[in-house]
C-alpha cells in the first residue's frame, strides 16, 4: 500500500513537471522564426513571436529580398490600420492562445494579398518547427506553412 502511494505521488509529480516544462524552452513558439517561400523553398522572412498575458503575437522583423527588389515594401493590399504600412514591423499573427496542445483562435495576415485568415499553430519536431495554418471557416479549408526556429 505504501509503495502504491509513493508511486502515485511520483506519477503526479512527473505529470505536473511535464506540463510545466511543455511550454518552457523550445516548447513555446516565443522566439524568432524563419518563414519559407512556398514556390521557391527559399527563406522569405523572419517573424518574431512574443507572448503577453497568454496571447501570442508575431511581427515581421526582416525580409529576405533580391537586391533589385524594394527592401522596405509597404502592405498596399492590407486594410485598416495596416494599409500602406511597412511590411517590416507589421503584426501578421495575433490572438493565438494555448489550448493544451496547440495555439488556436488567432488570425494571420498575408501581406502579399492583404487577406486576414483565422489561424492556429502547433510546435512540431521537438519545438524546432512551427506548423502555422491559415484558414477560412474551419481548419480543413486552409493552407499550412512550416516555419523554422532561428537559433
Indicate residue ranges for each PLM-predicted region:
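Short aromatic-glycine motifs in intrinsically disordered, low-complexity regions
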Residues: 78-84, 131-138
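Cleaved targeting-peptide boundary
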Residues: 21-28
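Central antiparallel beta-sheet cores of small beta-barrel/beta-sandwich binding domains
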Residues: 29, 35-119
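Edge beta-strand at a domain terminus
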Residues: 127-129, 135-151
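Short, compact, well-ordered microdomains
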Residues: 118-120, 128-131
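Short, linear, compositionally biased motifs with a strong N-terminal bias
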Residues: 10-14
